[in-house]
Structure formats: structure tokens, C-alpha cells
Amino acid sequence: MKRSRWLLTTGLTFLTSALLGFAVSCGGKSEKNTGSDNSSTPPEQETVSTEAFEIKNGGFESGDLKNWTAEGEAFSALGVSNEATTDDGQENNKSGEYYFAKYAESAEGSLTSSLFKIGGSGFITFKLGGGMNVGLTYLSVVDEAERELFRFGNTAFQELNAEALIEYKADLSSAMGKEVKIKIVDNSKDNFGYMSFDDFVTYYETEPSEAFISAEDIKPLYVSAEATPSFIKNADFANGLDGWQTAGEEDCFAVEHISGGRLSNKSDYGAVGVLRSSPFTVSGTGVISYRLGMTAHPSKTYLSVKKCGTNEEVFRTHSDRWKISHGESTHLYYADLSKYKGEALYLEFVDNSREQWGAISLEAIDTVYEKLPASLKDETAFDIKYRLEDDPTYETMRETVDGVISGIEDETLRKTFKNTFYATLDGFTVNGTNYSGVLRYYENGTAFCYTGDIPAMWLRDSSAQVLQYLQFMKVDKDVRNTVRGLLLKQFELIRRDPYANAFNENGSVWERKFELDSLAYPLWLTKQYYDITGDGEIFNAFFLVTLDKILTTLENEREHKDSNYSIISEDRDKGVNEFKNCGLIWSGYRPSDDVCHYKFFIPGNMFVVSALEDIVSLLESVGLNGEIKDRAASLAASVRTAIETYGVYNHPKFGKMYAFEVDGSNADINSTDGKLFMDAANIPSLIAAPWLGYCDVDDQTYVNTRAFVLSDDNPYYYVGEYTSGIGDPHDMVGSTDNPHKDVPVPWHMSIAMQGLTSTDKAEIERCVKYMTETTGGTFVMHEAFNANDPTDYSRDYFTWPCSLYAHLVLTKIFGVNLLNG
């Protein structure tokens, strides 16, 4: 039979006089003063008021948790019992009528007593049951600031009578006169992971008798922040477990588990315990790294990062990339602890699982990085508190939107709005074919968003596919967590390859077409997320690595070289490859995924400018006012200047307006050389400039441009029997010769953007009418469609335009805006 114990392995450098001051004393005899609500009666003695030294309701004789404060779900008044025996019929050794019995083993939490002053002999006594893994279940003595002064566990635990209460005495005399509280902590969900207790007596004139077991102080080793180095002692296990503390069963973490700098306890995966590092001060960039494997059961095997003194958990994670086929191999992880710079922390590796692969492999811990790791891709450690156990329900959002839907009288509008609003989440049915929702959720809190009929995630599309949900982040945590998870996935994919536009679910590249909007859209979504939620946690070191990757890529493409990126295949023979660097950012492809004719795509440059300006504002708001903010501001300003210099034309009919693409050679506003005049459906587009944030809707250059793109002078503006709108060279309806005015092929998304950028109510309503009546009887939006025959369309399953339509209808027609008040 295994017995719980506390084993300390540490170097002499940590055995300071400050720590020795908390040593436990043994021997001697005394009587206890129980206070009015404990069962024992003190002997006659001089009348001295001991009220200040006595815990209130220390024996739970009130029949509840009066004078105690519970946090979490591990402790409740329902756990207070007057039963005389345990669940298995054995004597429980309680005192008086009541005690706190076994309760909610699978829950975590804490229970804190009233304040009392340490006095008399400094000894206290108590009874403990359960709590086999003393690294996770224990009794702390804390001061008013929650700093831990002492820690005791049920070190005499016996599995055969696990619930039986065992009597302990503890010497607190080294903290004589301090006001303190008792805090029962239960961080265990299994393996006798509960605490039962009774009869807390906190004042004795002399040391209690030898009948009590002397409780051993097992708190983490810590002196002060000033005395704490920035590195962990023996982080590479070169000296066995010197500097490390272990708790739990003796064979859970042992020197025998170390080989070649790696600790792996797989050989004893049936044992449970905790491995605790020496304290370290967060320094440098605040990033730490380690290699971690196994941890197959994240609720029981994980890494916990805690504050020294208070033991507040600031981060919990596991090896989410590990698979059974990896065996004892480890994966590299980086964790961002920069918000705790200057503070002392420690690491706890928790193994509370007896199941197969319920083990931990660990190596290569590094707690000091003076520079951010530039090679970072998907090696970020995710906090388990954001782990998505189940698919989110979006209950609050659905309740609001379903109310809107039920009030729509027009059947076609009602069906179309419902289908398009929920398309990203739930999918829809078209012509007898069921299409599922496009979001996939991961345990690490990230989310992947398919584009629809293509099994890949576009950085651009995925940002727009959640547009209709964004305002609900204000009231629905599921929406908030999904968008947060989507952003984290986008950041990861950008770090993998900033030139790629689409990725497979496993992180590999689906398509590598360099498009400016692939970098601008995630920045746009980032600002939306922050403005609505106020959550700045994701703007950590890993975000800065991502932003640096984006800025470096954009800066390089202002001086484009094929050595950085080159157009390959037959696309290189399309358009004009010659260009002149002029301060604009080079782009290989448009948001349609078609190759650019001229390589400076003006709407894409506009989007980059507005996205960077927003990021500068965000960085200021979250206090990141360093070099990276200055780089973003400088790039945005210079590109804006270049757009207004090289991207404009004084049209004889429309006046000063923006070009669609330019080659950078012509700054003459009255010349058309090297300039392409058109607009296309995919976004970013010229008509979308105010929606992108580049200019106001009443900006005169935009007003002139809008008049052009919504006229027959735009070669891709189509007028048909059922509707009119902007199309795109990238269409699969009509002939292959573009443009084809004989077969008018507008896109739903361009009509939606026309409505979103309009201030004319009649125009907005007309756009919605056009879209609602041209679904070809499918009640969802498509890509291109024949304006003379809406049943002739491309792409049944394309959720991007669905999101635009739903957002337009919800905000501009029904006026639902949770962000205004």
C-alpha cells in the first residue's frame, strides 16, 4: 500500500535561517482552549480573554459554514455533516456534533476561516481526512494579504480509512502576534482529492500533548523577491532533483526518472504527486520555455505557474500537441509571463492521474529570454482556463437574434436572414444537400474556420465570416471566446508563413498567394475584438512576435525582391510584372486570389493603412508604446502618402478619384499611364474604403470614386433584369472573356458592401431587396450570379457573403447595435 508523504530535495543555498524559523517543534504536554463552539472543555485557569486568538466556528457546530468563506465548488454548507461514520461505515473520529465530510471530490476550490491572532504557545490543532496528494490538497495559514506563512497536509493519510480524521498539531510560534486565517485548499479532482476536517483549535497556553501528530510545514521554498534569482535551480536536472520539491507518492517523481536531462515518470504512471521548482524572478522579455510531453489527461496532468507567497495560480497548461505515437518525446513550448515581470513565481508539474499515459516528461526549462523568439510558430503554451470542453452554445446571442427572426413577417427575408446569420455556426441546406457549420473548436482555446466548400482557412475569409457575431462579444462569452480563439489561430498561421493566404487544419499551407488583405484582416479583427471586449490579455509577447512578422513582411514588400517572394506558374505571365518602388506595398494577388495586373493594389494598401493605424491606437491603449508601435505608425503614414500620390487620378468626368492598381511609375494626377481604373467585388475594394477605415463616406475623393465604380464606366459594374452591382474578373458564370456585359454577373458581397457604405436609406433597402430576391431559391448568398437568371450562380456553400448580408440586415434594417449604449 502506498502512503502519502512529503519529500524535500533541495540545495543548501535554500536552507536559510528565514526558512529554519518555520521549523516544527515536537514534544511537551498541554491542554487546549477550544473556544465556545468546540466540543472539548478547557481546564480551570486564570480568566484571560482569548477571543482574539480563537477561530470562529472552528468545529462547525453551527451546522453550516458560518464564518467561513468558500471559493470554487469544492466546499459548500452541504458538506457539513453530523454522521458518526464515513461513507464506508468506519468511525470518522469527529469532535462534537458536526464536521466537514467528504464532498465534491471532482471539484476544486478553497475555504477560508475568520481572522485570528497567533498567541499563547503558538500551537494550533486540527483534524484532517482525505487529501492524499498533499501537493494539491492542504491547509494553509495565510496573513491578511493572502501570503502563505505555513502549509500542512494530511501526511499520515491511510488509504484503508481515507476519510478518517487524523489529529495534528502545528507550531506557528515563529509568526507570533500576526493576524492570520486558515485556508483549506483543494486543487485535486481525483485520487482521494477531497478534504474532510474538524475541530480547529487556535489557542494553547502550552504545547499540546504527544497524542497529536506534529504537522510538517510543506510550503514552497521562498525567502523574498530580492533574494530570488531569475533562473530555476537545476533546471536541466543535471544534479538529479536538487533544488526541486516533490509531494505525493514516493515513486511519482524520483531521481531514477531522469535520463539525459529529461525527467519522465512513465515507468510509474500509476503514482500521483507534484514536482515543484525553486522560485524564479520573471525577467527579460518575460517569456519562458520548456519541453513537455505526455500530460494526456489535462485536468489531472498539467503545468501550473504560481506566485510565490500567495500561491495564486497565474497560468495552467499541458502538452496539447502530444499524441500517443510520440511516446515519451517532448514538445517545445513558450509561455508568456511578461505581465509578472519582477515578481517571483514557481512551477508545479502536477501528475494526479493513474490512467495510461497519465504521466509527465519534461526537459530544457529556460526562464530568461532577453529577446523574443523569432522562430516562434505554434509552440505557444495555451492557458487551460480558455480550454473549450464542449462546442459553445451562443445562448445569449441566439436568444436575441431568434427574437428578431420571429418578428420578420416576410417569409423570404425571414428564411434568408436566418440561414445567412447562422451559416458560419450551423451551416444550411441547399438543394437537398446539408452543409455543416465551418467553425472547428480546439481544447487549447483556438478555433479554425473553413471557407465553406473548400476545406481550408483563409486569413481574409475567416475574419469576415464572423462579422455578424462581433457585436455579441459584448454580451455572450461564447462569441467572445470563439473570436479570441480564431485570432490566436490566425496569429499562429501568420507566424508559420506570412506570405500564405490559406492553410490546412494541421497548419500546413493550402495556398501561398501573397495578398495584402491576408495580413490586414487579422489586424482589423484584432481591433474589433479589443474595442468590444476590452480584453488585452492576447496582446502578449506572442502577439508582438506576430506583429513583428507582419511589419517585417510589409516593410520588405515596399522594396519587393523575388528572393523574398515570387509569383510562380502561369500567373507570372499575366498582367504587368514591371513596377517602380514608390512607397506602396507590392502585392502578388487580389482578394479574389487572382494575380494583380499592376502590382500595387490600392484597396489592399488602403486596408493596410487603416489596420496599422488601428493597431497603433490599440498598442497605446494596452501600454505597448515601444519600437514596434513606432514602426507601425511610420509605415501607415508613409503608405498613406504614397496612395495619395501615386494612387489617384483627376478623371475628366468624375473628378479626383482612386485607381484600382498602379505600377508606381506615375505621380502625375492627370495621367493614366501605369494606372488601372475599375473596381471588383472582393473586399478590400474601392467602394469599401470607408468600411475599411481608410476614409469617411463623405470624403470627396471617395465620393467621386464611388460614383465611378457604380457606373457603367467601371468595366465590372453589371446591370441586369433583377439587380445591378459590381462583379469581378474571378467569376464562373457567363463567358471566360472578362468583362462580359452581355451576361451581367454581379456578386452578392459587393451589393452588401454598397449597402454597408451607404447613408441613403432607400439605397440600403434596395441593396437588401436585390440580395434577398436573387438567391435562386436557396435563401443563402452565393459568389457570382446571373442578374438575368439568379438560378445561374456559382458556389452553393460560401459563407463570407452570407455574413455580410446578415450583418447588413441586422444593423442597417433592424437597427440592432449592442455597441451603442
Place the predicted regions along the sequence by residue.
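Extracellular carbohydrate recognition and processing domains
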Residues: 144-180, 185-195, 310-345, 350-360
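C-terminal capping/lid segments that line or modulate ligand- or cofactor-binding pockets
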Residues: 512-514, 522, 676-696, 742-821
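Aromatic-rich carbohydrate-recognition surfaces in CAZymes
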Residues: 455-570, 798-815
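Short beta-strands within extracellular/lumenal beta-sheet-rich domains
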Residues: 97-123, 136, 166-168, 262-287, ...
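Extended, low-complexity, turn-rich repeat/linker tracts enriched in Gly/Pro/Ser/Thr and Asp/Glu
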Residues: 119-120, 130-137, 190-191, 283-284, ...
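Extended ligand-binding clefts on enzyme/binding-domain cores
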Residues: 459, 492-499, 503, 552-609, ...
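Low-complexity, Ser/Thr/Pro/Gly-enriched N-terminal "stalk/linker" regions
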Residues: 30-31, 375-460
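Extracellular glycan-recognition surfaces and repeat-rich motifs
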Residues: 64-98, 233-263
